[in-house]
């Protein structure tokens, strides 16, 4: 099936391109991006603390903030990572965080701690709860795959396959951290599980690339028919 412009759509499309490239930066709206997850989001081992909605406090959050600023986006990235958290605990607090911040984007990445005690199906169930909670409040969720664990982590590949399927099913962006870092993980990790500074910078790039897939899609889909 060939995708084409609807009749009369081209002038509107050209106007929107002009608006986004010229007028958009002049009328930039500040919005919030919530980084939500476990100790990897919080910033351990590089920053040994939990996030509580803080800004510039650790993990990939400061690097992502810099990428957004360089791209001319008026965004504030807040760190809501909590060390040792399982997906069940994450799902129990995600509504509270969304209500507090009213973010535009929710960056969701958890599951590593679950695999010490629970099944990959438990991760899927609870990550689905987090995605649905975001969508129900009009927040754009982006789902992250979990990182390698060179200390002997098990079922990571199977879990990430389920997360990829979830993102496809919900039609939301996937930040595939595992694929991005697995070949060079030894140089990107501090302890085999948590990233080092270079690893967190790489994570920020993966999140940023996933965020870019959202911005124009709703506008363009209104202009195109199949």
Segments and roles (model prediction):
Residues 29-32, 71-76, 101-107, 135-142, ...:
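Loop/turn elements at helix/coil->beta-strand transitions in domains of secreted/extracellular proteins
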Residues 1-14:
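Bacterial N-terminal signal peptides that target proteins for export
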Residues 58-65, 88-100, 121-130, 157-161:
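Alpha-helical scaffolding within the catalytic cores
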């Amino acid at each position: 099936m060939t995708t084409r412009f609807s009749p009369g759509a081209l002038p509107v499309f050209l106007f929107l391109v002009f608006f986004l490239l010229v007028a958009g930066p002049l009328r930039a709206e500040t919005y919030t991006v919530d980084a939500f997850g476990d100790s990897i989001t919080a910033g351990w081992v590089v920053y040994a603390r939990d996030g509580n909605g803080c800004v510039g406090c650790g993990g990939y959050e400061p690097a992502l903030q810099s990428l957004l600023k360089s791209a001319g986006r008026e965004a504030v990235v807040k760190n809501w990572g909590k060390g040792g958290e399982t997906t069940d605990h994450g799902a129990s607090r995600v509504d509270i965080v969304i209500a507090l911040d009213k973010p535009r984007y929710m960056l969701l990445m958890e599951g590593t701690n679950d695999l010490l005690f629970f099944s990959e199906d438990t991760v899927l169930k609870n990550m689905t709860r987090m995605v649905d909670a975001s969508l129900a409040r009009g927040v754009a969720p982006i789902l992250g795959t979990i990182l390698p664990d060179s200390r002997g982590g098990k079922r990571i590949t199977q879990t990430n396959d389920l997360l990829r399927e979830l993102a496809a099913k919900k039609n939301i962006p996937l930040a595939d951290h595992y694929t991005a870092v697995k070949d060079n993980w030894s140089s990107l990790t501090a302890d085999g599980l948590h990233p080092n500074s270079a690893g967190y910078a790489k994570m920020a790039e993966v999140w940023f690339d996933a965020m870019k897939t959202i911005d124009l899609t709703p506008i363009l889909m209104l202009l195109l028919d199949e």
